């Protein structure tokens, strides 16, 4: 086992590693260790001998660097590449030179190692040897010099015996003899062995560090591939031709020279005199191209003829076949003036040849990678060759790509390179397809890809995700090729080279067929007549280049050139006039229409060049080429015809005379039409006025040249008749082409302008019609009157609409929104406004519309305002966090003080209107009284039936259910502490099909529920909504706030307006006030108010309609018991009467200090007798007067609102309103079970028309955790009322201790129950499943619900006498929460009430229920104890219900 010597100096590179334990990793490990035996075993297993590590280093590089001689021999024998490039460009030859071991370097040189290669820093192996230290580098440098000297001697013509004696670098190791004495080398390298010249074999191939070569039979030193190696003196400049050089890429230059009397083109590196060291690496490109060109043979690849080495062997030049024209890039962009006409069949023929060369490369496993117009060389007329193979990569069997130079593509070629090549990723066959497609676009549009953008900018653009696109000006078959070929992703480049070649070949056949049948015409307006002389199609003769009349061709070419052409600036200065010159007959025969071109057209063309317009840019150069080539062919045909009839020119003149007037007439007609079209185009729009003026001037200049043949006709003796005709025809063709392009552009402009005008007119009409419909609707709404109720309600009963007269419009003018509600509106609104845009407009029916003020009518961006979120106080707008309880309470009281005065000002007007509407029919009153009496009797006997909660049982709406689709559920808005539901009011429509496409802010439409039960989810989420309606008022306003109780959170009711433009908003309002037959409309109006960033909504709440299409789900936080409580409330009795209040009643502000219950009990065991009702009426009048409405303004909505708020409140004139108050009283007096209370919701809202009772709600520490009540709320509320209640009795404190012991055992069950009742996403899904199961049997009661109902009935039985007492002593109850009334009376009344309630509850509780619900029963009893919560400071589970009524004396 050989060991490498340690490095005395730092190594130029770091050795790479492996991240896994593969065979390749073991190979490198054994190479480091120098273990030859194990290395052979690994190689015999078939591992890749050139496997690389993380630095791109092969095992041979590692072994050579560490000086393992035996391992180097083994790896070379197994075929390892001595010129393998690492990631830094170094090779094993560099490593061997650094190691200082001459035997290792000689072995690598014999295997083909090259001493001329450089790393990325420009260092060759000799430079690496010098870095190893003087002791080790001296002998190594001398060895490399001996190899160089020996190679020079062989090239300079030393005798064959010299190569015969020293045939291997190993013979040069040690003290070098001067080509005489020999040093014994390898036993296999015998100097006496016989060489067989002319036979290429392993023994006849030599290598001394300058490439492998062999001797031919003529004793010619030849590289493999039979490439002669010549000296630099053998290639010289020809005497009969000028020097001609051109660039063949960013670093290479090609020069036409002569070698051995053969005209060749020599390619060499173009470097400055003193290049930077990194530039020295570019010399490797020629070596790589030499290697590839010597191994590849194809007719369309540029043929490499010889390799020229300099005397010092530092420079290398490649000798290729003669290139006559140059690169395609130079023809298209650098010397285009010399080649004004490129025939289409020539272009296609060139592209076919390039495609064939690429197909050959791909078949050999090579990828060009640097294909561009620089790589395409036009060697002769119509003959192209592909070259520039220095960046060629080879695909190996393993799938990897071998890059000889490992040099990145230069930035100058990024304009043609595929995105993966630019980003230095692996190139594939489709990378060459991309570059070939770019060349097709370049040659047909005369524009450099990426508009000549710098390569570095191209890379940045591609990195940002921008890619090259196909030019729309390309002809049809080529546009498809380019569009598919230059796609950014390789997988989308579906067209391969064989397909492209097939399309090009068929297109070329069509060209040739069109040329034979119609020599003067073609599908593209150009001639394809073959020219025997290449000068006609490529303009190569010197006479053609020196011809002054050719300037007009240059000018014609410049008209169509692209603005980014690199040579545009050189053609902008041309002479305005050209003097007529006498041309040779040969030139006249070739260019007949150039001989007699008058000076005015040239001046006209020069003027056009000096003032280009947008229309000129549209004329690309290949279109001008087609036009002009057609003129050339036409002139040639005319010349031949003229020469054929030269014997009788007299007979030919009449035909010419007839032809000229006809041409003049056609041209005059075309001129008039163009001028008329331009004048018409100018009158359409003023947007493109300047551009049209420029186009019109350009047309005038172009057409002005058509009138110039007048002096030509006068000078008939100077010109022949055929030249005049040809002049007319050429001008006609040119102007016709220009006119066609301008016509197309003008037509496109006209079409766009007409569309814009139509859109504006349509929008104006829609705006006018919708404004008129809005005014008509307002008049209809103002005159709408509804009759009072005439009978008891049914399940489908709808309360009538109340209207308020005399309310003025807002100051901003027209920013109120009027909405209507009818059966099924929630479902229709869900279906219509969560679905697609309406396909037709409804003639009648309610449609949402956005408020539009006159100032912002035209601004559609401001029409996306949403209706204000209807919230209770204490809740911020969507997305905002809950404020602190102290801030919420202060804001609530502040809003109450601000609004109480405005409410009182409106109350008398409301009452007067309502009293006028109470003149009911006597028969109707009789029916109502009978119904009330019957209902009361049922209530007394306990037989008052529960209305079914499932609206599907309602018969009147079954037909409507069939025609309506399933609505979408309301998406929740999740706050920090509670989950709020958005409630959307729907608008009544005449037809049942969904209308309108309304986009709602912050709405999620993805959770569409396709089940039928989801129709009711929306309404059930209206948390305690009531609908009192007002009649005969012009502008009813809807001011809604959500009710909240200790068991449910504040329901967030959010009204969304459409986010569509103004047209869509107004069209949904057309005929929106039409009434639906069989139903009564309910009208609401949302008013926007601004007041200290608070959303203030006065609240006559909505009464939930118990019908099939209107009823929807309550909030998910409500339990089944609460659902039943709503359905079994006293609203059935409330709807059955019409008893008025006194007119002198008024409203008075009352501050609520405790959260309220918002639902009435399920049933009442104590019915209301006529006496109790009449006695309660006076109390409730003052209760309603003292009601205040606490609303909060959402800060996220900014409407054109008014500064002051109009507070709308009403005195309810029926038993329905009084019963509603009773309902809230019962709900306040009832002690709900703790497990059904969801204290997570914030409950600090007031309720209008329901009750003025404020419930102080207290929970213990355990109850707070169980119910998720925010502790801040509890502390804030307790501190507020801490000093208002008397101290607790001693007996209550004793019972508290007993209560604590009972709660220990029942705490776990309560926590589980509260957790089940929390509003979570899992609960939402569970509730929806329950709704689905109950939609068939119309039942939603489970075993838990039955138990809850029993608890509720038991609670109601204890409140009978309390209710009567509360109704008879409102003053005392009011004083309970009024701190100004004195604490003595408050303490007395509360102590008496609590003792009485406690006694009655103990008697009513059943013995068997006491054991199972001991903790709950204790809670119900202790919560009514007067003052124990004050001492405990909310630390114990308790709940005090304080009943508050207005003072009648006030």
From Swiss-Prot:
What does the entry's PTM section describe? Phosphorylated on Thr residues by CDK1 during early phases of mitosis, promoting the interaction with PLK1 and recruitment to kinetochores. Phosphorylated on Ser-431 by PLK1 during late prometaphase promotes the rapid depletion from kinetochores and its subsequent degradation by the APC/C complex.
* InterPro entries documented for this protein: Ankyrin_rpt, Ankyrin_rpt-contain_sf, Kinase-like_dom_sf, Prot_kinase_dom, Ser-Thr/Tyr_kinase_cat_dom, Tex14
Q: What does this protein do?
A: Required both for the formation of intercellular bridges during meiosis and for kinetochore-microtubule attachment during mitosis. Intercellular bridges are evolutionarily conserved structures that connect differentiating germ cells and are required for spermatogenesis and male fertility. Acts by promoting the conversion of midbodies into intercellular bridges via its interaction with CEP55: interaction with CEP55 inhibits the interaction between CEP55 and PDCD6IP/ALIX and TSG101, blocking cell abscission and leading to transform midbodies into intercellular bridges.
Q: Name the gene for this chain.
A: Tex14
**Tissue and organ distribution:** Detected in testis and spermatogonia. Not detectable in the other tissues tested.
Assembly notes? Interacts with KIF23 and RBM44. Interacts with CEP55; inhibiting interaction between CEP55 and PDCD6IP/ALIX and TSG101.
Task: Determine the domain of life of the protein's source.
Answer: Eukaryota
Further comment found in the protein's record = Used as a marker for intercellular bridges.
Gene Ontology terms: biological process: attachment of spindle microtubules to kinetochore; cell division; cellular response to leukemia inhibitory factor; intercellular bridge organization; male meiotic nuclear division; mitotic sister chromatid separation; mitotic spindle assembly checkpoint signaling; negative regulation of cytokinesis
The written remark on domains in the entry is: The protein kinase domain is predicted to be catalytically inactive.
Return the protein name.
Answer: Inactive serine/threonine-protein kinase TEX14
Q: Where are the ANK repeats?
A: 27-54, 55-84, 88-117
- Could you say what the effect of mutating residue 792 to A is? Abolishes interaction with CEP55
